Amino acid sequence: MEQEQGFIDYIEQSIIKNWDRNALTDYKGITLQYKDVARKIAKFHIVLESAGIRPGDKIAVCGRNSAHWAVAFLATITYGAVIVPILHEFKADNIHNIVNHSEAKLLFVGDRAWENLNEEAMPLLMGIVLLTDFTPVVCRNEQLMEAFEHRNVLYGTRFPKNFRPEHISYRKEESPEELAVINYTSGTTGYSKGVMFPYRSLWSNVAYCHEMLPVRPGDHIVSMLPLGHVFGMVYDFLYGFSAGAHLYFLTRMPSPKIIAQSFSEIRPRVISCVPLIVEKIIKKDILPRIDNKIGKLLLRMPIVNDKIKADMRKKAMEVFGSNFDEIIIGGAPFNAEVERFLKQIGFPYTIAYGMTECGPIICSSRWETLKLASCGKATTRMEVKIDSPDPQNVAGEIICKGANLMLGYYKNAEATSQIIDVNGWLHTGDLATMDTEGYVTVRGRSKNMLLTASGQNIYPEEIESKLNNMPYVSESLIVLQNDKLVALIYPDFDDAFAHGMEQSDIEKVMEDNRNELNLQLPAYCQITKVKIHFEEFEKTAKKSIKRFMYQEVKG
């Protein structure tokens, strides 16, 4: 598909065509129809215009997923301003820095995030507006204050017979290369960079979603991924909204219990999530329904009984609402044994590989054609290579170019030149192989690769994937200490204590796990020691562990 219309056309046409359909719902809260969204956008455009905010100015939004978060986003881009989504999980200092670095004129903020912020630390802002009810809590501009106070009067004067579809005429991007979004990375290295997305990237990513799995007007989609991250922004929001779907925002952490309850009520057609959520549901909700010991065995052994396969598939489908065509999993490595189990029972999942800098999609395939352990082929309008003399057998860095790519990092030409070379290839930092059909299999991140004194390259993710399936292991991290491999393990304390175990019992089980794991590993990557971690590892928005925080192991 070639780009025949602008991205804003996508949004405009969807609102007009689906005027009387439900658009955005906060789970157990408000519902906005497409016409309600259009009218709120119109009011915001009046406020922005009256306050002297111009196309190209930056507007930031920081808060949990909600219908009003989506309205703030849409009002910004349809006005021609640049939206700056900020993860609400960021520390206050980081949010202050992002607002200042992006030169945002306005900040839409959730009430919880606002509690921790200091307006004095963001001196460039004209105003700060609460997402809960769009009340301005800080106004440093008299025109902005007047516009907010009189927005209903101004709206009524401009549209005396109410706002109708024929009134919609949003500012269209002047070029596909025009800046639309600055998205600051969460990253595992501790430093946020502003990724600049042109409208070209938004269009290409959303168009690919529709090419792979067309969404129908009225289809239900549950938004679990943080909208402040580009994976959630594209898959859980723009993909569905541009097709007239009805989006539900959970507005809370997507625990297995909340997912089971909400999905049974909403019955979504498309589901996007990070691997951690699927892994927890399979291990804690699906397999134990049979028998805990048998369930764990099923992760490791082939399932030959068709009745067991059908039963397991039915149970897994029920947890996710039974109505979906496909679950799209991305954002972090997927546990190999959980994936093998899903493949065996014919569960409709697919892996999407990408990175923030590609907005985010690089590789993906429909579940019917996806190969085990692969993340699919290069998406349309993207070209992917493996920087290796033998890409089929020797892992090399994934490099890519195409329509999805960012413009660069905002106000950071040096960092841009380090990731995009002179020929336009983006260097992902991920290591992979590619088979003769073009299927890519990610082996690990080059920066995570551990190099031993003997010259062996070790990919910790592959070891962690095995360890995470062992008894009472919740999550793990493999690090190198004095040229020896050490496993940091956060046990599943709740499960262990529920079975009457004490600390000494947990330590013994972890040592048994180490011995069992080493039987499955070559001599050069044997684990010499286990260290128990008593808190969950700190993670990014994509639920990737922040490895840089745990490299110095003591004891």
Where are each of the predicted segments found?
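Conserved AMP-binding A3 loop
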Residues: Q33-K35, A180-S204
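Conserved AMP-binding/adenylation subdomain of ANL enzymes
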Residues: W203-H220, L227-K314, N323
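Conserved AMP-binding/adenylate-forming core of the ANL superfamily
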Residues: Q3, N22-G52, D57-S66, A70, ...
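Gly/Ser/Thr-rich phosphate-binding loop
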Residues: R269-S272, I282-L370, S474
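Conserved C-terminal "lid"/linker of ANL adenylate-forming enzymes
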Residues: L450, E475-V486, R514-G555
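Conserved ATP-binding/catalytic segment of the ANL
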Residues: K385, Q392-T452
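Structural core segment of the AMP-binding/adenylate-forming
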Residues: A51, T78-R158, D483
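Conserved pre-ATP/AMP-binding loop-to-beta segment of ANL
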Residues: W19-D20, F148-Y184, Y191, P214-H220
